[in-house]
């Protein structure tokens, strides 16, 4: 079983917001975020996955999720790379 760290993007009014998480079922988790059953922060928004990375263990994924959540520069670079291609 693999674990994934992912970055989601949503446009709210005139700006973009992001959400970082980890899971062992990426498709199901994104569907949950886009439904009313996702995390409290993600409810009611349309989320697009813009980054995901696979890890062999849950602890690796959790460590990388923590790093990505706290590395605003890296998140911004990922967002800019995605938005450049729109």
Spans of model-derived segments:
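C2H2-type zinc-finger recognition helix
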Residues: 58
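Short, surface-exposed polybasic/aromatic micro-patch for ligand or macromolecular engagement
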Residues: 55
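GIY-YIG nuclease catalytic motif and its immediate N-terminal context
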Residues: 1-52, 62-69, 73-76, 80-86
């Amino acid at each position: 079983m693999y674990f994934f760290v992912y970055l989601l993007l949503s446009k709210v009014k005139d700006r973009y917001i992001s959400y970082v998480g980890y899971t062992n079922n990426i498709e199901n988790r994104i569907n949950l975020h886009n439904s009313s059953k996702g995390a409290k922060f993600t409810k009611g928004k349309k989320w697009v996955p813009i980054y995901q990375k696979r890890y062999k263990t849950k602890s690796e994924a959790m460590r990388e999720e923590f790093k990505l959540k706290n590395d605003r520069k890296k998140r911004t670079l990922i967002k800019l790379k995605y938005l450049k291609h729109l």
